[in-house]
UniProtKB/Swiss-Prot annotation:
Signal sequence extent: none
EC number, as in UniProt: 1.2.1.41
Similarity section: Belongs to the gamma-glutamyl phosphate reductase family.
Keywords on record: Amino-acid biosynthesis, Cytoplasm, NADP, Oxidoreductase, Proline biosynthesis
Pathway: Amino-acid biosynthesis; L-proline biosynthesis; L-glutamate 5-semialdehyde from L-glutamate: step 2/2
Catalysed reactions, as listed in the record: L-glutamate 5-semialdehyde + phosphate + NADP(+) = L-glutamyl 5-phosphate + NADPH + H(+)
Protein's name in the database: Gamma-glutamyl phosphate reductase
Species in which this protein is naturally found: Xanthomonas campestris pv. campestris (strain 8004)
């Protein structure tokens, strides 16, 4: 079957989904979560095949981490589906309701987008997360994962499709593209009369490819070059906690810290404590001359280091004379993803928040909270640094649009 035929089937199934009640969608998502539990052994076995093949190819640590499913991670995926199931249904929400002077009633109502294409690599959890969010919002979803996760994605999709069938919903509402040729992906991205939105998740190369070749709208973020600025008034212990969690808890995540900026007035107190905590987590440090004056044992940082998304246990450090210099650095090297300030000065916190255009800005909180689940959205479908209808971590509302519904009693304009 051609990719266009698959997309047309998904569009027809999306029409069925759009008519389901909130209760029916909740029951469906709970059944999908249960299907993952039922098929857990097969899913983990399939994932192990993918991981083994990736290791044989010499895949890097960051990609391997994203690819790997453990029993705990798979359980967390099911838990995320259950969280999405009980979230308020955005479809049908009325966001405006007023009566015009001529008596017509004007409402703005949330409706599904239609068909969403997810293009991703080495992230089998996205198969379930994306399906759950799209279906909850009444959309069909076309999933095109990477070849490195094909066995994992297929096992997850089969479990979820079984739940759809048993609920009387066409399984085409969740369509997994098994033809992984690049030409097929290109054809999918050209289907502007069928596909309403494409969301790429993966490496910068994949995301740029999708953005450059798609004829459908694309919501994306290229990379996550996230910063922590430690202000002169920062609590040292607090800032160290933010740094270690942001850098070392899961360095392959796009919300992990890549660069540390330290105010010169606190550098001699903060940097030794930070270095000791990071060395305990095997983090490689690279710094500018002012940083190396305090930490002479670390390597010199290059200009490329400050622009890098390491996705690894590597951190670039720079000492700055003031907040304005820190903000200028972030504007030059940042990716509009997530930025953090550690400070006890409210005015500096407010300046930091108001001066940056990043999708998420944090004060005295870890960058790792830049996640749909942590921000109360349920499982996220992606993070947008595209200033369109959604900005930042994207949950259910980002998968709907508002339309006008007008009710009258025969009013005419002229």
């Amino acid at each position: 079957m051609t990719i266009k035929s698959l997309a047309l089937q998904c569009r027809d199934a999306a029409q069925v989904l759009s008519q389901l009640s909130a209760d029916a969608k909740q029951a469906l998502l709970l059944a999908m979560a249960n299907a993952l539990d039922t098929d857990a052994t097969q899913i983990l076995q399939a994932n192990q095949r993918d991981v083994d093949a990736a290791r044989e190819k010499g895949t890097g640590a960051a990609m391997l981490d994203r690819l790997t499913l453990t029993p705990a991670r798979l359980s967390a995926v099911g838990a995320a589906l259950r969280e999405v199931a009980v979230l308020p249904d955005p479809v049908g929400q009325v966001t405006r309701d007023d009566v015009r002077p001529n008596g017509i009633r004007v409402q703005k109502v949330r409706v599904p987008l239609g068909v969403i294409a997810m293009i991703y690599e080495a992230r089998p959890n996205v198969t379930a997360d994306a399906a759950a969010l799209c279906i909850k919002a009444g959309n069909g979803v076309i999933l095109r994962g990477g070849s490195e996760a094909i066995h994992s994605n297929t096992a997850i999709a089969r479990a979820l499709q079984r739940a759809l069938r048993e609920a009387g919903v066409p399984e085409a509402a969740l369509t997994l593209v098994e033809d992984l040729r690049r030409e097929t992906m290109l054809e999918l991205l050209q289907l502007s009369d069928i596909v309403d939105l494409a969301i790429p998740r993966g490496g910068e190369g994949l995301i740029r490819f999708v953005a450059e070749h798609a004829r459908v709208p694309v919501i994306k973020h290229y990379k996550g070059v996230c910063h922590l600025f430690v202000d002169a008034s920062a609590d040292v212990d607090l800032a160290v906690r933010l740094l270690v969690d942001g850098k070392a808890s899961r360095p392959s995540a796009c919300n992990s810290l890549e660069t540390l900026l330290v105010h010169a007035d606190i550098a001699e107190r903060f940097l030794p404590a930070a270095a000791a905590a990071l060395r305990a987590r095997n983090v490689e440090l690279r710094g500018d001359a002012a940083t190396r004056a305090v930490l002479p044992e670390i390597a010199a940082a290059s200009d490329d280091d400050y622009a890098a998304e390491f996705l690894d246990l590597i951190l670039a450090i720079r000492v700055v004379p003031d907040l304005d210099t820190a903000l200028a650095h972030i504007r030059q090297y940042g990716s509009d993803h997530t930025e953090v300030i550690a400070t006890q000065t409210p005015a500096n916190a407010e300046t930091f928040v108001q001066s940056l255009r990043s999708a998420v800005v944090m004060v005295n909180a870890s960058s790792r909270f830049s996640d749909g689940g942590e921000l109360g959205l349920g499982a996220e479908i992606g993070i947008s640094t595209t200033r369109l209808h959604s900005y930042g971590p994207m949950g259910l509302e980002a998968l709907t649009v508002e339309r006008f519904v007008v009710r009258g009693e025969g009013q005419v304009r002229h």
